[in-house]
UniProtKB/Swiss-Prot annotation:
<dbReference type="InterPro" id="IPR028628">
    <property type="entry name" value="Sirtuin_class_U"/>
</dbReference>
<keyword id="KW-0520">NAD</keyword>
<feature type="binding site">
    <location>
        <position position="123"/>
    </location>
    <ligand>
        <name>NAD(+)</name>
    </ligand>
</feature>
<feature type="binding site">
    <location>
        <position position="154"/>
    </location>
    <ligand>
        <name>Zn(2+)</name>
    </ligand>
</feature>
<feature type="binding site">
    <location>
        <position position="134"/>
    </location>
    <ligand>
        <name>Zn(2+)</name>
    </ligand>
</feature>
<comment type="function">
    <text>NAD-dependent protein deacetylase which modulates the activities of several enzymes which are inactive in their acetylated form.</text>
</comment>
<dbReference type="InterPro" id="IPR029035">
    <property type="entry name" value="DHS-like_NAD/FAD-binding_dom"/>
</dbReference>
<dbReference type="GO" id="GO:0005737">
    <property type="term" value="C:cytoplasm"/>
</dbReference>
<dbReference type="InterPro" id="IPR026591">
    <property type="entry name" value="Sirtuin_cat_small_dom_sf"/>
</dbReference>
<keyword id="KW-0808">Transferase</keyword>
<feature type="binding site">
    <location>
        <position position="108"/>
    </location>
    <ligand>
        <name>nicotinamide</name>
    </ligand>
</feature>
<dbReference type="Pfam" id="PF02146">
    <property type="entry name" value="SIR2"/>
</dbReference>
<feature type="binding site">
    <location>
        <position position="151"/>
    </location>
    <ligand>
        <name>Zn(2+)</name>
    </ligand>
</feature>
<feature type="binding site">
    <location>
        <position position="37"/>
    </location>
    <ligand>
        <name>NAD(+)</name>
    </ligand>
</feature>
<feature type="binding site">
    <location>
        <position position="234"/>
    </location>
    <ligand>
        <name>NAD(+)</name>
    </ligand>
</feature>
<feature type="domain" description="Deacetylase sirtuin-type">
    <location>
        <begin position="1"/>
        <end position="245"/>
    </location>
</feature>
<feature type="binding site">
    <location>
        <position position="107"/>
    </location>
    <ligand>
        <name>nicotinamide</name>
    </ligand>
</feature>
Length: 245
């Protein structure tokens, strides 16, 4: 009964909210079949991964960098992954006229493929790369088709649009600005272990006074920063909300 009441309350809050911000992590994409790279069995378990994905390694050995980059993120099979119910739910809220912005730690681009227009890619995206000289952009298929992708105009080895270790977060200030404008923060599918993103719920709750909602299978240790906690898969949460119609 309490569970049903929580869903009813959250549905009512979302209907009344003027500005909704959603923070998503790996759990938003695992239901599409994408591995959680930071899990115990994920590719981040390799001790060398942080080096391979670092700005310094790209600068020193760009050809070797691209070899490891493609292996780590399984670039050649990435087209098989499709947006799931959670991605579509957020896009549907936007289609209903809601002012909703997604702050995602994911680099898969599935929020955009699912139809969301206002997405801030905190860690960049796998879907594109660019020339470090002329800034021309290239898509995922171009990266797949070329062992070491180079700019067709300049012949420079492309720079991936993923934020590498050693880079700053270029979208951080945009994310913070949005956070301070929001009525509701929904955190979905993230363990909240990586800073500075781990501080977002506290900012929203303590400084902004927003309503905060957590949807995650595992406890995060930050439950005290949330008004509502759903220990569920995102798809289950969406189905629960949908059943309140």
């Amino acid at each position: 009964m309490i569970f049903v009441q929580q869903f009813e309350e959250v549905r009512s809050i979302l209907e009344k909210a003027k500005k909704i911000t959603v923070l998503t992590g790996a759990g938003a994409s695992t239901e599409s079949g994408i591995p959680d790279f930071r899990s115990a069995n994920g590719l981040y378990a390799d001790a060398n991964v942080e080096m391979y994905l670092s700005r310094g390694y790209y600068n020193r050995s760009p050809k070797e960098f691209w070899k490891h980059y493609k292996e780590i993120f399984q670039i050649n099979t990435f087209h098989q992954y499709k947006p799931n119910r959670g991605h579509r739910f957020l896009a549907e809220l936007e289609e209903q006229g809601k002012d909703i912005t997604i702050l995602t730690q994911n680099i898969d681009g599935l929020h955009q493929l699912g139809g969301s227009k206002h997405v801030i890619d905190l860690h960049g995206t796998l879907q594109t790369a660019h020339c470090p000289k002329c800034k021309s952009g290239y898509d995922l298929q171009y990266m797949i088709d070329h062992e070491v992708p180079r700019c067709e105009k300049c012949n420079f080895i492309l720079n991936p649009d993923v934020v590498l270790y050693g880079d700053t977060l270029p979208q951080y200030q945009n994310a913070i600005k949005r956070l301070y404008e929001t009525d509701v923060l929904i955190v979905m599918g993230t363990s909240l272990k990586v800073q500075p993103v781990a501080s977002f719920p506290q900012i929203a709750k303590r400084e902004v006074g927003a309503t905060t909602i957590l949807v995650n299978e595992e406890l995060t240790g930050q439950e005290y920063n949330f008004d509502f906690v759903f220990q569920n898969k995102i798809g289950e949460f969406v189905e629960g909300l949908s059943s309140m119609k």
